[in-house]
Amino acid sequence: MEQNIFDYLVEGLDLTAFYSFIDSKTDIDKNTPKLVFQYTTWSALFNGIIRSNEEDDKNVHVFSTNCQYLNDPKEVETGEQYVDMALNGFFGNSGECDDLRHRNAIFMTSFSENENSLPMWNMYGKNGNGVSIGFDLGLLRSHSGGTIKRCLYDTPLNRTLFQNTLSKERISEVENSGDKFQQYLMTLMDFAKKGCYEYEKEIRLTRQVIEAPEYRLSENFIVPYVDNVYPKEIVKKIIIGPCNDFDRSTKSLQGWLHKIGMDHVEVTYSMLPYRNN
C-alpha cells in the first residue's frame, strides 16, 4: 500500500484542537435539523426537481454543480486559504497542498437550515416569487453517495480560533494518521466559505465525480453538473414565497402534488414582510 506523504509530516504533532475545531463547525450530527431547504424558482421545482412524467414519477432530482461554477466564482479560494494556513502553521510551507487545489471533479449542492429567510428569498427565491423546498436530511444523507456537512464561515473570530489550533510543536508519544489529516484538509477545502454568507447557514453536499457530467445553460455560460436522484419521499415541505399570489399558488401547488402522488408534502406560505419593487 502506498504511504500517505502526510504520515511522516504529522508525526508527533498534537492535532486534537485542529480536528475538534473543524468538527465543531462542520459536523451535522450535533443539533441536526430534520429538514434542509433550497430556495428556487417555480420553473426549477416544476421542470427539474420534481417531474410529473410517467417515466419518472417516483423520483426527485437535485443537481450538484462543479465547484468551479458556483454562484460565487471564488468559492474554492476560501478553502484553499484555510488549507494553506494549516500547512504553513504545522509545517512552515504549503507545498503539499497542490493535489487538493486541483480537485476539479468536486460537485456541490447547497442547502440551508433557514426555511424562511428574507435575504435567501432575495438571493435565490426569485425576489420572493419562488419557493423554498424542505428536504428530509436523514434521507438525503442515506441516499447521497457523498459528504454532507455544515459550512465553516471565514469570520474574523473563526479565523482566529482556527489559527490558534496550529502549532509546530512535536510530542514524541503522539501517533497520527496521514490519511485522517488529509481528510480534514479536504473538509476545509470543500466546506470553508466566505464569512459574508454566514446568514445562509449552509449545509453542503459534496461529491467527487469520475464519470462525465451533464451540462446545462446558465445566464452566462454552460455549467457542468451531475443529477442526484432521490425518492420523492425526501421532499417534506414547500414554502411559497412571500410575493406570490397566496390563494392561487397554494391551490394549484396542492392540486399538482396530489396528481403526482405527493400528498405527504406540507404546503405553507411565507408571511415575511417583503417589498418587491
Regions picked out by a protein language model, each given a short descriptive name:
Residues 1-277:
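Partner-binding and oligomerization surfaces adjacent to conserved cores of proteins
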